[in-house]
């Protein structure tokens, strides 16, 4: 192929782009590439989740979908004139600040959301409100690049279990529910995290949002279709769980498990999605040749007319974007370099009336404290032979990979056979959970976090204090204490933990002595 022939398509492409668009596009491309490079770790983590996690595999389709959405609007948008716009810098600054807070709190989802919103803010700052209005839906759809949804798993597990119980009752299958565990004559079943239905739900939300924009014009129809896309996967997952248990009663658990993975995993939800699409088909009110945007409305919009005068030179906007990045990344780097002093070792504390014992748990329980600088796990037994387990961890800082209250950390370790059953009885300044392992074995766990003068069972309160410390460039250690007891001992688990707390004295002082900070 001759060099001249290879250059022809590029030349034709440039001819299609008006001259007044070429430099702004280069500025935008440069800004986006620089942001992706600077926050590459977050984009790499997102891409890793898209590829490795079946919950987020559907996001691999989002970038080409966004490209297609842009292509459908491009010819009309090129009729507009891009211009710098200073309110876009406010959006960008907010996103950069959110990224820094997410970095301080070790919240990857906050950093990843911020990385996406920074691209949107840069677009606003460099292209202006009129171009942004024309590209509003593709810009909004970029939010689906953020792998979010795992936070819904506990709620969806509980909801699926309740739907399953209703369906079992309607089908006259006797069953007993205990949290997310269901016992029937066929066996003992758990609505596990993988069976929560979160994969189908978040994929359906992304799909429904796309269809609502592309296939509908009226907002009532869009809202109705989105409602169907929210309700249907939740109910369908309940049907899936019920069907698995019902089949287990006829053919056995092993057959039901295989059937679940093959039919429900690959076929059932495809059928449900097709049925939702078929149900909505006759209500589509956008003709196939309708333009995706009415560019005349965008040009005549009174709202955009009021916003557009807030202009800023594009070079000035680009410089301001760079300055904001330097400010927040530099601030975060200084905070990340700070570490609190922690003891070289933690002494095993004596507890009056209790003595150390070897592990005698009916089912192994090992809390997870990833990234902790010091940790202890001990079992104390009283004169009656009843035991309380103590898990203590100390961190010199809170950040990604060192999160006292991070996902899958603490009393319900990620990847274990333990599952959350219900909230436990109230304990002062603590979070109380009943967890369950196969057997079943029931265990009460009371979690408390300590940093500075704060003692709480709330992960949110801990995060807020940790974030404040980082904002003020203040370093303080963070400790987590979990007191736990199995049910089925000489006394109920809550009574055992209360007795143990009475023996150790004030919990804050006990935690501080172990951390050597008082």
Feature locations, PLM:
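Hydrophobic N-terminal alpha-helices or hydrophobic patches in metabolic proteins across all domains
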Residues: 2-518
């Amino acid at each position: 192929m001759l060099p001249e022939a290879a250059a022809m398509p590029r030349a034709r492409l440039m001819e299609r782009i008006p001259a007044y668009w070429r430099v702004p596009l280069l500025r935008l491309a440069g800004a986006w590439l620089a942001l992706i490079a600077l926050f590459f770790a977050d984009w790499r983590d997102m891409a890793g989740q898209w590829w490795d996690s079946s919950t987020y595999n559907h996001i691999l389709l989002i970038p080409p979908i966004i490209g297609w959405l842009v292509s459908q609007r491009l010819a009309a948008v090129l009729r507009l004139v891009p211009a710098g716009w200073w309110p876009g810098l406010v959006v960008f600054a907010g996103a950069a600040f959110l990224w820094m807070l997410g970095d301080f709190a070790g919240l990857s989802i906050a950093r990843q959301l911020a990385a996406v919103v920074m691209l949107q803010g840069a677009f606003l700052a460099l292209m202006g409100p009129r171009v942004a209005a024309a590209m509003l839906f593709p810009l909004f759809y970029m939010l689906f690049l953020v792998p979010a949804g795992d936070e819904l798993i506990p709620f969806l597990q509980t909801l699926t279990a309740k739907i399953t119980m209703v369906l079992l009752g309607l089908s006259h299958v006797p069953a007993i529910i205990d949290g997310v565990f269901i016992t029937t004559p066929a066996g003992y079943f758990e609505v596990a995290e993988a069976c929560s239905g979160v994969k189908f739900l978040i994929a359906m939300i992304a799909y429904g949002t796309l269809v609502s924009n592309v296939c509908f014009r009226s907002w009532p129809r869009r809202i109705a279709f989105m409602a169907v896309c929210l309700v249907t996967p939740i109910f369908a997952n309940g049907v899936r769980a019920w069907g698995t248990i019902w089949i287990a009663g006829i053919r056995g658990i092993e057959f039901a498990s295989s059937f679940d993975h093959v039919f429900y995993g690959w076929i059932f939800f495809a059928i449900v999605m097709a049925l939702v699409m078929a149900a909505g088909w006759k209500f589509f009110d956008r003709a196939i040749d309708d333009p995706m945007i009415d560019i005349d409305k965008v040009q005549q919009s009174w709202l955009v007319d009021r916003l557009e005068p807030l202009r800023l030179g594009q070079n000035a906007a680009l410089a301001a974007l760079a300055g904001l990045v330097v400010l927040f990344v530099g601030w975060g780097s200084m905070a990340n370099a700070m570490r609190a002093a922690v003891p070289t070792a933690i002494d095993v504390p004596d507890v009056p009336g209790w003595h150390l014992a070897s592990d005698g748990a009916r089912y192994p329980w090992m809390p997870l404290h990833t990234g902790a600088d010091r940790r202890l796990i001990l079992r104390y037994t009283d004169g009656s032979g009843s035991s309380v387990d103590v898990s203590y961890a100390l961190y010199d800082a809170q950040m990604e990979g060192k999160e006292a209250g991070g996902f899958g950390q603490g009393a319900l370790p990620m990847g274990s056979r333990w599952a959350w059953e219900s909230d436990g009885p109230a304990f002062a300044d603590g979070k109380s959970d009943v967890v369950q392992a196969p057997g079943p074995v029931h265990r009460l766990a009371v979690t408390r976090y300590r940093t500075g003068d704060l003692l709480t069972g709330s992960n949110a309160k801990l995060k807020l204090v940790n974030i404040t410390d980082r904002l003020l460039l203040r370093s303080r250690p963070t400790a987590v204490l979990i007191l736990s007891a199995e049910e089925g001992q000489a006394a109920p688990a809550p009574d055992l933990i209360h007795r143990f707390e009475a023996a150790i004295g004030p919990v804050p002082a006990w935690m501080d002595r172990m951390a050597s900070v008082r």
